[in-house]
A protein has these predicted regions:
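Generic solvent-exposed, charged/amphipathic alpha-helical segments
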Residues: 15, 19, 23, 52, ...
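Nucleic-acid enzyme cleavage-core boundary/entry regions
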Residues: 1-2, 31, 35, 66-68
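Charged, alpha-helix-enriched surfaces in structured cytosolic catalytic cores
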Residues: 9, 13, 46, 50, ...
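A glycine-rich, hydrophobic loop/mini-helix early in the fold
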Residues: 38-74
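Basic, low-complexity intrinsically disordered segments
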Residues: 8, 32-41
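Residue(s) in the substrate-gating loop at a strand-loop-helix junction
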Residues: 77
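An acidic, glycine-/histidine-flanked metal-binding catalytic module
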Residues: 1-29, 138-211
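Long beta-strand-rich cores associated with HINT superfamily self-processing modules
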Residues: 66, 81-186
Length: 211
């Protein structure tokens, strides 16, 4: 096992464990027949090339990565509606299996690029052969519309190294505004949407019972 494998193994363990736990939250809502504020959960460990690039840009030595780079372990929690994000953040604050050490609200404080999301930095303990180890992880909570925009912007940022042509920058700004308006409109009819989803779920369950 090389140096990078040894370094990243605890992060992979943390992501795997956190995905199970956070997905379990959604399942608990479903079992209780309550509407879940969580649409789905994803997770990943930052690629080695991305870690090296970020470390070089910020002057972080290898032996300080575990303390100074908080997003090597990353998770995303998707919500249907903007106000679901506050619910999810409150749930994370109340967890006893990890410690919230920092929060960054890019929804009320939108980045200049148009990026919107809520970031929660946590310290998560894992058990290893050498004892307990504390891992920093970043949980991003956002709506589906926010995620669509962020995914496209992330891809373009790599292509242009963050220096967008004026036309691309203009279109990204317009797309960010459109994503914001979509979230606003969906929030206005949230009750109707959730009622329809509940009706569909119940109807599908009855169909399976009769099959």
């Amino acid at each position: 096992m090389n140096q990078w494998d040894q370094f990243l193994t605890p992060y992979k363990q943390a992501v795997d464990e956190l995905k199970v736990k956070l997905k379990g939250l959604r399942k608990q809502y479903e079992v209780g027949e309550n509407t879940s504020p969580i649409e789905f959960v994803t997770g990943r460990v930052k690629p080695i090339s991305s870690i090296i690039d970020k470390a070089n840009k910020r002057g972080i030595p290898f032996d300080r990565l575990h303390e100074e780079m908080y997003d090597i372990a990353g998770l995303r929690m998707m919500c249907q509606f903007v106000d679901d994000i506050d619910v999810v953040v409150d749930i994370l604050r109340q967890r006893r299996d990890f410690k919230v050490i920092e929060e960054r609200d890019y929804i009320r404080n939108t980045k200049e690029s148009g990026y919107r999301s809520y970031h929660v930095i946590i310290e998560y303990p894992i058990e290893t052969l050498n004892g307990q180890k504390h891992i920093l992880a970043e949980i991003q909570i956002r709506t589906l519309a926010m995620n669509f925009w962020a995914t496209i912007e992330h891809t373009l940022r790599y292509k242009y190294d963050g220096d967008y042509p004026d036309e691309i920058q203009h279109r990204l700004e317009r797309a960010a505004e459109a994503a914001y308006l979509l979230d606003e409109e969906m929030s206005e009819i949230k009750d109707e949407i959730q009622e329809a989803q509940k009706y569909y779920t119940q109807k599908r369950a009855k169909k399976h019972e009769n099959d």
